[in-house]
């Protein structure tokens, strides 16, 4: 265990500890919880409430669900066009968090036709969280999301449109996967819930963080292809599974292994002993292209690692984590030595945000408590909210269902694999999204069949819970005009709720717009207060720093600041103080001509 005593009493650590505890949610959470409670009480008193209405709309939906291809397309198009329709009220997101800017750096790099960028001359002023500066200037994350966002930038002028399209494909793939495991009507319902609870509002679609849409798409393809392959062994299902495995490898390979390992075991058993398996020659012919795709993807990832990090066997994350972090990713790993931080904001992020949690997990009570809390927020709350919690009361019945036995047996492996990680955020579970939906919908089927004293209370409750999800989505569209928007980090817990973030990042975007409208090239030197929240980072740049209209740099000591200003002597130099009550641009203060600029750090 590593001591954090010098930092444990900082204001930042105090706020981080408060924000990570279970606390009352904002108005949207309270409204949904209230409606869920009312619905439960109503069905106990009037178990047939709304039956005439629901009985009229369910048959045509069931007929649609039986047309499986059309259902999948409808789910994907609904996710796409509904999100576009609400753009006037729910705008294209601005980058806000450290992860956002890191993924956008990858997208910009790929859009420039490069796999990495050379280390800039003044790199110590540009150091930031979740990026590497040496051996190259690059995002620390796996390249999959960056490649997709680069396509969005090149094709549509904005990387978010690629996120939107990928999110729509994710919702469609979830519906397609569910069709292989559940009756068609329930698969369509699952796809609709994916649109309402993930595709429209969650941070998966409305930030640039995580690439969840890509790993969830990959997981859905793998889990959806498995039963189809074992039934028909068609070439297309093998290719879809291979595409899913590649997507997992380019986004979240650790979780991808947790998902793919039991799939490989079951598939291998079928290949050896399955009664309906095709002849070996046919299998080899049909497996050649999928296997070649996977091998090519692994080779390309090795080449990318070589270009970006200097070694084909050095995976993304490794350089940045070894350079800046103390806490490792898994409980069995020892803590890293204390780095020599050049910037106090980065020191506080890696110590107050990460190391305290690492130390807590190294006691038995701490491990149990933190693990339960992580899964409560990242799995239960994110995927169920409050409206979808009641079906989980009958979740134990799912454990005995033959239909989903494979997914039930996978669940302990997935949970154990995630529990040994130091951190757990909902997008870490993205590869398992389709599986989680299948298990949750099966619990909902059991609730629908619940008939206390012969009355259809369960049927009515399921209908009302789905109605609540639809109503809450409508309310979320108008959340900003109604002043129901979720609070910003670190006060809010919007990352763990379906309603997602509000309109964050406006201050930095406003300052950057001002700078871009000025004639000539600009250099913005950022001075933080001692109590700055490191997650609200402003110092991020494009792939080509020296060629950018606006450069963001950290203020350091006076001599380093002077070197920076002299290097960019053709640029107008500005001071930006993000923590001041009124954020505005001001000329960077110089002591006198030819002297070192004054530094807030030396006052």
Each predicted region: which residue ranges?
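Hydrophobic, aromatic-rich transmembrane alpha-helices
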Residues: 42-44, 171, 266-267, 273, ...
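Signature aromatic-anchored transmembrane alpha helix within multi-pass, membrane-resident enzymes
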Residues: 71-73, 260, 264, 288-295, ...
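Hydrophobic/aromatic-rich transmembrane helices and adjacent perimembrane loops
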Residues: 103-104, 211-212, 251, 257-258, ...
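Membrane-interface alpha helices of multi-pass inner-membrane proteins
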Residues: 150-151, 177, 190-195, 225, ...
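Transmembrane-helix motifs of polytopic, lipid-linked glycan transferases
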Residues: 158-182, 220-222
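Transmembrane-helix signature of polytopic, membrane-embedded enzymes
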Residues: 174-198, 216-217, 230-240, 401-409
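Perimembrane helix-loop-helix junctions
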Residues: 225-228, 258-298, 302
């Amino acid at each position: 265990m590593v001591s954090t005593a010098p930092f444990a009493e900082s204001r930042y650590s105090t706020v981080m500890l408060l924000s990570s505890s279970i606390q009352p949610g904002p108005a949207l959470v309270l409204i949904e919880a209230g409606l869920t409670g009312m619905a439960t009480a109503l069905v106990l008193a009037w178990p047939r409430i709304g039956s005439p209405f629901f009985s009229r709309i369910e048959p045509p939906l069931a007929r649609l669900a039986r047309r499986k291809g059309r259902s999948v397309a409808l789910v994907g198009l609904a996710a796409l066009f509904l999100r576009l329709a609400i753009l006037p009220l729910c705008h294209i997101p601005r980058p806000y968090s450290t992860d956002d800017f890191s993924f956008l750096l990858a997208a910009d790099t790929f859009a420039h036709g490069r796999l990495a960028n050379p280390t800039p001359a003044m790199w110590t002023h540009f150091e930031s969280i979740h990026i590497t500066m040496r051996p190259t200037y690059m995002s620390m994350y796996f390249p999959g999301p960056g490649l997709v966002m680069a396509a969005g930038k090149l094709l549509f002028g904005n990387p978010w449109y690629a996120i939107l399209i990928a999110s729509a494909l994710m919702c469609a793939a979830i519906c397609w996967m569910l069709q292989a495991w559940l009756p068609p009507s329930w698969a369509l319902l699952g796809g609709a819930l994916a649109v309402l609870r993930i595709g429209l509002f969650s941070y998966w679609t409305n930030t640039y963080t995580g690439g969840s849409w890509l790993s969830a798409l990959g997981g859905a393809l793998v889990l959806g292809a498995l039963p189809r392959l074992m039934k028909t062994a068609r070439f297309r299902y093998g290719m879809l599974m291979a595409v899913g495995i590649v997507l997992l490898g380019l986004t979240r390979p650790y979780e991808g292994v947790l998902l793919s390992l039991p799939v490989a075991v079951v598939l291998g058993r079928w290949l050896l002993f399955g009664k309906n398996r095709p002849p070996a020659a046919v299998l080899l012919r049909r497996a050649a292209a999928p296997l070649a795709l996977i091998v090519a993807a692994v080779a390309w990832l090795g080449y990318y690692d070589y270009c970006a990090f200097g070694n084909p066997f050095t995976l993304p994350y490794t350089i940045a984590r070894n350079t800046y972090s103390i806490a490792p990713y898994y409980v069995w790993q020892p803590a890293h030595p204390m780095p020599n931080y050049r910037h106090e904001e980065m020191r506080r992020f890696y110590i107050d945000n990460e190391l305290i949690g690492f130390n807590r997990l190294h006691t038995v009570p701490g491990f149990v408590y933190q693990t339960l809390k992580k899964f409560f927020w990242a799995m239960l709350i994110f995927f169920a909210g409050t409206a979808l919690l009641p079906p989980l009361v009958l979740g134990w019945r799912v454990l005995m269902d033959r239909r989903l036995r494979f997914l039930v047996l996978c669940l302990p492996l997935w949970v154990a694999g995630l529990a040994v990680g130091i951190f757990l955020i909902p997008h870490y579970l993205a590869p398992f999204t389709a599986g989680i939906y299948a298990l949750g919908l099966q619990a909902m089927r059991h609730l629908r069949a619940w008939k206390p004293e012969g009355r259809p209370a369960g049927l009515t409750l399921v209908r009302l819970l789905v109605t609540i999800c639809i109503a809450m989505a409508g309310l979320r569209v108008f959340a900003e005009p109604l002043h129901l928007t979720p609070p910003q980090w670190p006060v809010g817990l919007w990352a763990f709720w379906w309603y997602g973030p509000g309109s964050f990042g406006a201050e930095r975007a406003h300052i950057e717009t001002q700078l871009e409208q000025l004639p000539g090239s600009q250099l913005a030197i950022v001075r933080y207060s001692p109590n700055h929240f490191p997650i609200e980072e402003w110092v991020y740049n494009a792939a080509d720093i020296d060629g950018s209209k606006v450069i963001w740099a950290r203020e350091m000591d006076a001599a380093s600041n002077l070197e920076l200003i002299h290097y960019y002597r053709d640029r107008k130099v500005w001071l930006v103080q993000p923590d001041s009550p009124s954020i505005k641009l001001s000329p960077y203060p110089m002591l006198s001509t030819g002297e070192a600029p004054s530094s807030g750090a030396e006052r």
